[in-house]
UniProtKB/Swiss-Prot annotation:
Gene Ontology BP terms: cytochrome complex assembly
Organism of provenance: Bartonella tribocorum (strain CIP 105476 / IBS 506)
Binding site for heme: H138, Y142
Chain's role: Heme chaperone required for the biogenesis of c-type cytochromes. Transiently binds heme delivered by CcmC and transfers the heme to apo-cytochromes in a process facilitated by CcmF and CcmH.
Subcellular location: Cell inner membrane
Protein name: Cytochrome c-type biogenesis protein CcmE
Length: 159
């Protein structure tokens, strides 16, 4: 081998090494950019993704900040009071603690005492949970009202 081919081989190795370093740097930069983007998405979505909290999980900060959240549990028996045309006051409980809920609007068909609910809303200055939306939960034996009516009609016709 002559001296010229050794120099070419050495310079080729240097060039390949530089390209590898450059490629590695680009990959690391892309990973860093994706990590920052993912962090920003998670940070922005932290309030949008709202799982419900049970009354015993409510903190003093939740009450003082008044930020929107979901309160979940059961409608405490004997606490439902209707106020005016579309207002209702009731307590949501998890059998450890309860929170007073004030709601003004149409109630879901499944809403009743002892039934599971998720109430979207916020705490006011007095510490009452002001509901803006109520989602009534049902158990595994739930059947829509229309289905029950059809079954009753069908059953009474057959007899």
């Amino acid at each position: 081998m002559n001296n010229s081919s050794l120099e070419n081989s050495a310079s080729l190795k240097v060039i390949l090494k530089q390209r590898k370093k450059k490629r590695l740097l680009i990959i690391l930069l892309c990973c860093l950019v994706m990590a920052i983007a993912a962090s920003l998405v998670v940070y922005a979505m932290r309030h949008a993704v709202s799982f419900f909290r049970m009354p015993s999980e409510i903190t003093r900060e939740d009450i003082l900040t008044g930020r929107p959240l979901r309160l979940g549990g059961f409608v405490e028996k004997g606490t439902v009071r209707y106020v005016g045309e579309s207002g209702v006051i009731f307590f949501v409980t998890d059998n450890k603690k309860h929170e007073k809920v004030v709601f003004n609007g149409a109630l879901p068909d499944l809403f009743r005492e002892g039934q599971g609910v998720i109430v979207e809303g916020h705490f006011d200055k007095q510490g009452f949970f002001i509901g803006t939306r109520i989602l009534a939960k049902h158990d595994a034996t739930y059947m829509p009202k229309e289905t029950v009516d059809r079954l009753k009609k069908h059953y009474s016709v057959e007899k």
